[in-house]
């Protein structure tokens, strides 16, 4: 039984990137994982992803870029106000304007850059750089 499917997908992306693999198959195809992958695609951390619709949950086929240095899931999922985002950026990212935090907000899943522009906070999900 899996406890954190987002963690499984992020770790498989990190391991495949370190091994130099170009594509991976990750399961299950959950909505939250798809939205996190979309944010990663928007910032060119992955080239593309698609849902392979099979029975029992489905799978994602993810095509990787070589630009991922590190990525991980943030646990526990801290609720963060917009004015406190900088504190978590310095904690999880190596330098200013290098990498993104992925958070879920009332407006959907987005990066810390978009959340700061909209002036909203949310719960931290993951970091990528």
From Swiss-Prot:
Membrane-spanning segments: none
Molecular function terms, GO-annotated: rRNA binding; structural constituent of ribosome
Keyword Protein biosynthesis: no
Keywords assigned by UniProt, alphabetized: Ribonucleoprotein, Ribosomal protein, RNA-binding, rRNA-binding
Example of a GO biological process term: translation
Highest rank taxon of the organism: Archaea
rRNA-binding in keyword set: yes
A cellular component term, taken from the record's GO annotations: ribonucleoprotein complex
InterPro entries reported in the protein's UniProt record: Ribosomal_uS8, Ribosomal_uS8_CS, Ribosomal_uS8_sf
Gene3D superfamilies named in the record: 3.30.1370.30, 3.30.1490.10
Pfam families: Ribosomal_S8
Subunit structure: Part of the 30S ribosomal subunit.
HAMAP family: Ribosomal_uS8_A
Protein family according to the UniProt entry: Belongs to the universal ribosomal protein uS8 family.
Function: One of the primary rRNA binding proteins, it binds directly to 16S rRNA central domain where it helps coordinate assembly of the platform of the 30S subunit.
Name this protein carries in UniProt: Small ribosomal subunit protein uS8
């Amino acid at each position: 039984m899996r406890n954190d499917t987002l963690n499984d997908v992020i770790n498989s992306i990190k391991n495949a990137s370190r091994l130099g693999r170009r594509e991976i198959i990750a399961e299950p195809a959950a909505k939250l994982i798809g939205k996190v992958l979309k944010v990663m695609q928007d910032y060119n951390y992955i080239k593309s992803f698609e849902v392979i619709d099979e029975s029992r949950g489905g799978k994602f086929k993810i095509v990787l870029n070589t630009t991922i240095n590190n990525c991980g899931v943030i646990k526990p999922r801290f609720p963060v106000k917009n004015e406190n985002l900088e504190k978590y950026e310095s904690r999880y990212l190596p330098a200013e304007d290098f990498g993104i935090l992925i958070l879920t907000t009332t407006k959907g899943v987005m990066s810390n850059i978009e959340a700061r522009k909209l002036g909203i906070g949310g719960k931290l999900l993951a970091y990528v750089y």
